[in-house]
Amino acid sequence: MHGVRVGARACFATHAGSEARVHPSRMPRYAELLEQLSQVRPLVGGRPLTLSEKLLYTHLLDPAVDLAGAGADASKVRGARYLRLGIDRLAMQDASAQMALLQFMTCGMSQSAVPASVHCDHLIQAFEGAQADLERSLDTQREVFAFLESACQKYGIEFWRPGSGIIHQIVLENYAAPGLLMLGTDSHTPNASGLGCLAIGVGGADAVDALTATPWELLAPKVLGVHLHGKLSPWCSAKDVILHLAGELTVRGGTGYIVEYFGAGLQTLPATGLATMSNMGAEIGATTSAFPYTPAMG
C-alpha cells in the first residue's frame, strides 16, 4: 500500500494535537460469530442458510427478537422485516464525512464506538494531472481537510490524507476481511466484499448510527444466487461477468437483494475481480454482494 495514513502526526490540523486514539484494524471474532450462528439455527427452524444470511444473522444484536416466529419460512424474513445489526467497521469519504462528523460531535461521546476511517479522495478533482490536481485540492479544500483531520484525531478515527489513494482500494487492502460487516458512505462501498465480508453503502445518518453504536436497521435483503461454473475465455475478465448480469437485470433488478455468487467458477477469479463484481453490483441496485472464501483472498 503506497498511501499514507495519518495518526498522531498532524498534516493539516489547526492545532498541535495529541496522540490519536486510533482503533486498530481487527479480524472478526470468529468464535463469537459461530456461537451466535448456533443460536440462530433453531430460530429459523434449522433450515439451511445462505452465506449472506449467515453473515447478517451473526451480526444481529438480538436474534431472538428479530427472528421471532420466522421458523423455516425464509419469506417471513427476507424483504419482510427489519434486522437490527451491530457494525464492525465504518469508512467515510471526505465529501460525506463532514456532516456525519458534525452530527457525531453533538452526541457527547469521546470517541467513535467502532473502528472508523476518513478518506480524502472525492474532493480531489481531475483536471491536469495527479500532482497539479492534488495541489489545487489542497488549496481550495484546505479548511475541509483541516476540519476532518482535527475531528479524526480527537475522536480516534483514522485519517487518510489527500493523496493517500481512493477509499475503496484502501479499505480493500487494509480493512476488509472475511466475515466482517462494514458500512461506508459511498454507493460503491461493496467493493470491499471482494474479500469475503459484507460491505454496504449508506448515507451520513447511518454513519452516525455506526459511530455511536446505535443499532443499524436494514430491511432483510432477498438473496439472488449466481452460479459460476467453468472459467472465463481469453480476453474476458470478472467485469464481463457483472456486465452480463447487469444486462440481464437492468439498473433496478438487484434492488433489495444481496447478490450471492457460488460455484466452482469462483476459484478461477482473483480477489480484485470479485471486488470489481461487487463494486459494480451498485449499478443494478444491489444492497451488496457475497462471496465464499477462496484462496485468492489470501
Per-range role (PLM):
Residues 18-23, 177-298:
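Mobile "lid/hinge" segments at catalytic clefts and subdomain interfaces of large enzymes
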Residues 22, 26-29, 33-222:
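Long, structured ligand/cofactor-binding scaffold of large enzymes
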